[in-house]
Amino acid sequence: MTWLSGLYFICIASLIFCAIGVILAGVILLSRKLFIKVHPCKLKINDNEELTKTVESGQTLLVSLLSSGIPIPSPCGGKATCKQCKVRVVKNADEPLETDRSTFSKRQLEEGWRLSCQCKVQHDMSLEIEERYLNASSWEGTVISNDNVATFIKELVVAVDPNKPIPFKPGGYLQITVPSYKTNSSDWKQTMAPEYYSDWEHFHLFDQVIDNSQLPADSANKAYSLASYPAELPTIKFNIRIATPPFINGKPNSEIPWGVCSSYVFSLKPGDKITVSGPYGESFMKDDDRPLIFLIGGAGSSFGRSHILDLLLNKHSKREIDLWYGARSLKENIYQEEYENLERQFPNFHYHLVLSEPLPEDIAAGWDKDDPTKTNFLFRAFNLGQLSRLDNPEDYLYYVCGPPLHNSSILKLLGDYGVERSSIILDDFGS
């Protein structure tokens, strides 16, 4: 009886605890409705009455502008890490937040510069926004395919209206607008080859419900570099990595949500409609005679492919081009066959593949695990295989894109060799 009594007590206590949680949540929601009054606010833009937008208070400036048809670029998805959603609040600027203070100079803060993803709309405001953002457009596209090209990376291929081409440049990016949705990660197997199942099963990533059905309209968007180049229109491509929660004891932490936009992308199937906006970007090609070195890792493959295919197939560039691409194993390598074909076709293009964790089957197939220019972290392989052998590393132009640790390692390495920061084009979404 003692054991049953204890179990009964635990069950009752658990029910009471859950009930208290539900009541508190209800009180918070009711309080917000009663005490936080939503009211209309006017956003006057560039001192032009015709551009004035009326929005509801309480949202961030980024979301308010997006819902009004002005998609301010926010590659990091509103996390205040990319620092690109800058606007100037000319009138009625609130006190800057710490994220603003770490982004802008004292003079810029006094002039009203703020990160729109952090700035709340509570009253009428006058804004100054760059014309290029006001001229950004949106397009509806149809998903052609959405297959995995690596364990955690999809190649999203979308067809847009050929009569309304997207005027993007290689190295540019578009923002994907995320509607409300609910998905189960097991359904993503429909667009995933079975060879990738084992890792997903090992990390318990299947049968995970991602519920963003209450997502406010037009409240979420994230930027992704284009993997395609302009000559491939009306088809556009992206390489997009799933943002999983951090792992605890080999399983995803249920307390941390999955990436809102990447989960939406992974749920897409051929025939689905999506909306993109832009184009944006700063990491374009510098058209001079300097030889080019691309240092790319993971889903940075988008950025590298767009530039390299445009240089070779569209511009017929004679510049020396080296691509160093880093992946864990051959299963994770992206566009290998395409780059090998380009290398055979163009004598000025050189493709270097580096694996950090080659699989036994890679080694059995002939991969040299003992060559430090092939089996290594990319920055070390690049240093051994090319950088240390250059007479004047500062005379090259470097294009860098990959995970944060990849980017920081490359920047430090190039800095150690005296390469000026102006000679490094970094595509960094603050992930």
Swiss-Prot record:
Binds 1 [2Fe-2S] cluster. Keywords: 2Fe-2S, Cell inner membrane, Cell membrane, FAD, Flavoprotein, Ion transport, Iron, Iron-sulfur, Membrane, Metal-binding, NAD, Sodium, Sodium transport, Translocase, Transmembrane, Transmembrane helix, Transport, Ubiquinone. GO terms for molecular function: 2 iron, 2 sulfur cluster binding; electron transfer activity; metal ion binding; oxidoreductase activity, acting on NAD(P)H, quinone or similar compound as acceptor. [2Fe-2S] cluster binds at C76, C82, C85, C117. The chain crosses the membrane at residues 9-29. Residues 289-413 are annotated as: Catalytic. It is found in: Cell inner membrane. Residues 39-133 form the 2Fe-2S ferredoxin-type domain. It catalyses: a ubiquinone + n Na(+)(in) + NADH + H(+) = a ubiquinol + n Na(+)(out) + NAD(+). Its EC number is 7.2.1.1. It comes from the Bacteria. Residues 136-286 form the FAD-binding FR-type domain. GO terms for biological process: sodium ion transport. The keyword Calcium does not apply. GO terms for cellular component: plasma membrane. It is a single-pass membrane protein. Its cofactor is [2Fe-2S] cluster; FAD. InterPro entries: 2Fe-2S_ferredoxin-like_sf (IPR036010), 2Fe-2S_ferredoxin-type (IPR001041), Beta-grasp_dom_sf (IPR012675), FAD-bd_FR_type (IPR017927), FNR_nucleotide-bd (IPR039261), NqrF (IPR010205), OxRdtase_FAD/NAD-bd (IPR001433), Riboflavin_synthase-like_b-brl (IPR017938). Disulfide bonds: none annotated. Composed of six subunits; NqrA, NqrB, NqrC, NqrD, NqrE and NqrF. NQR complex catalyzes the reduction of ubiquinone-1 to ubiquinol by two successive reactions, coupled with the transport of Na(+) ions from the cytoplasm to the periplasm. The first step is catalyzed by NqrF, which accepts electrons from NADH and reduces ubiquinone-1 to ubisemiquinone by a one-electron transfer pathway. Belongs to the NqrF family. PANTHER family: NA(+)-TRANSLOCATING NADH-QUINONE REDUCTASE SUBUNIT (PTHR43644), NAD(P)H-FLAVIN REDUCTASE (PTHR43644:SF1). This is Na(+)-translocating NADH-quinone reductase subunit F. The gene is nqrF.
